[in-house]
Amino acid sequence: MPNLSQHLTRRQALEILGIGAAAAALPRGAFAQDAAFPKGAIIRTVLKDYAPEELAGGATLFHEHMQLATDFNAKFGAATAAARAANAMPAAAARGGAPAVAGAGGNRGGAGNRGGGGGTPPPDIMHNVDLMSEEVAKTKSAGIACIVDGGHPDMGRDINFIRQVSMKSGVPIVAGGGFYSQPFYPKEISTMSEGDIVKALIKQADDDTLGVFGEIGSWDEITADERKVFRAVGKAHVETSLPIFTHTGIPGKSALEQLDILEDAGVNPNRVIIGHLGNLVDANVYVHRAICRRGGFIGFDRLGGNGDAQQIPMMMTLIEAGYADHLMFSSDASSGYSKTITVFLPKLKAAGATDEVIHRITVDNPRRFLAFVPKRSRKK
């Protein structure tokens, strides 16, 4: 991963998040009322459970990756290319580039070298605890209080690696989990019953101390196996209360269907983030509004790159329509873990977003999403 050139000092980052000295000097009421949480709610990280109030001192990134299999990018690129070809779309831009028009997902791109561009971190970092811990530790100076790792076993993520990174970096990390998408599923998914998948998800949640199911994905048309997994994730949510965030390969085709499947399985949409919707470039934000109206969250999760210019007008339209409480920000490991704060937020503020709105989106919304009242005791 490149040595990040931060566009904000720590003091500036904290102030734009609404938690610095300048923000503290504002009159009471200048920012939204503190987020409210159910009695007994916790945010589960790999090392400990936090009261949501304990993570109010900075931003939470809802979708990042700290470890992926060495062949992950190749498989991801092939799945993206197949989905785009099936929809007569041009090849996707590399991760960190402009999102595709008409709702196609972006490409993770190559890992590149350590001085490279917008791809995921290279294997020498993603498989070295000390190097990854150094990168994650840098986020503290950008005002980041917590990071969600959206990997799981079928993506090549080792939960013990994430625990060590959290311990060494001092940054609380929420572990995602589940089953990713058809090209990545273990072979047995096709023959497992929905009930068997529910049991496997609950076991994974217990053994790996998951704090969220995600990212849970589909690519083009949702396959029968993907539909089965989505239903199972919804039912596992009912048993565990863990929130859910998704991956949409072709957002314009699958976003609403993903939410439909989860809701039919018993999930309240306010426990769901539909991911990669920054890639669905639509001035009218039709799908985005529909999800917000139902109570769901919109994931703008490839921030800090050239694509910001196409995403910010959509965000501002949603903010002006009163949907700031439904937006979530992150970079999906494509642009450097701090760039959502240090590169992207100054652009959003320049477009007219207030400090109060930025605070709600980056500090309050992720805590409201991640907080849950556990139905099962923590194993580790």
What is each of the regions a protein language model found here?
Residues G112-G116, P123-D124, A142-F161, S166-G195:
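Metal-cofactor-binding active-site regions of metalloenzymes
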Residues Q33-A35, A79-G118:
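Disordered, low-complexity segments in secreted/periplasmic proteins that are enriched in proline
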Residues Q164-K168, P172-P243, R294-F297, L303-G305:
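Active-site gating/metal-coordination segments in enzymes
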Residues M1-T9:
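N-terminal secretory signal peptides
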Residues H63, I147, H237, I298, ...:
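Divalent metal-coordination and catalytic microenvironments
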Residues H247, D301-L303, A324-S338:
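Short acidic/histidine-rich active-site segments
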Residues N160-R163, K187-E188, T223-K228, P251-G266, ...:
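Distinct, well-ordered alpha-helical segments
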Residues T9-L26:
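N-terminal export leaders
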